[in-house]
Amino acid sequence: MLDIEGLTRHYGTETAVDGLSTRLARGELTVLIGRSGAGKTTLLRCLNGLEQPDAGTINVDDAPLAATDAALVFQAGALVDGKSAVENVLDGALSREPAWRELIGWHSPDEKRVAIERLHDVGLAGYADRPVEALSGGQQQRVGIARALQQQPDVLLADEPVASLDPETGRSVLAVLARAVSEHDLFGLVSLHQPGLADTVAGHYLGMADGRLVLDRPAAEVDSDDIEGVYANG
């Protein structure tokens, strides 16, 4: 299990995450919802090690979560133009390879093989050499997911990954994300402004308001009134 206990993060006098406690299960995509400013992004950044909480613990299988154990898919993909899809995926291996290899563009044959496999995982097997700027928005987000998988994480996070996509494309990207979490037996957490897009792939819902959890329930037990209640808070 991924156990979050008493997680708190302050910005000056403002409390972004307020004593949050929950548990996530492996192989299941948890959908994180709430108004803008509810604390969703701060929670993800604490889980990814981009920010340090002021209090609380984050443990995976009873051991502290390390920053290298979590990978984050960003809202806008954060890909590098001028590089191919597979080159962007290979950037996910930087924590495991010497920096000089990236400087000269050299990666081990094993890393290249795995990168191709990760593109296959997200439905882009034939796009390895395609420049990322030539890909559609949905395809770019799939490359972002493949790059995150290349990090070999225990925890796969995504911060509003479909915010700029049309609903049909957004659903397909979320399906890819959920499949990756299931097939690689990861802990998955994705924040969304459009919770309806995830109704077929969510295994669990977390709802935040004013830095606190106001919903923590399996998807099968969540209805539209519960979702609306999250947005009525705060």
Where are these regions (language model features)?
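H-loop/switch region of ABC-family ATPase nucleotide-binding domains
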Residues: 192-193
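Conserved ABC transporter NBD signature motif
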Residues: 56-68
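Helix-to-loop junction immediately C-terminal to a conserved catalytic motif
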Residues: 48
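Conserved ABC ATPase "signature" region
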Residues: 101-127
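Catalytic Walker B motif of ABC-type/P-loop ATPase nucleotide-binding domains
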Residues: 156-159
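Conserved ABC ATPase signature
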Residues: 131-135, 139
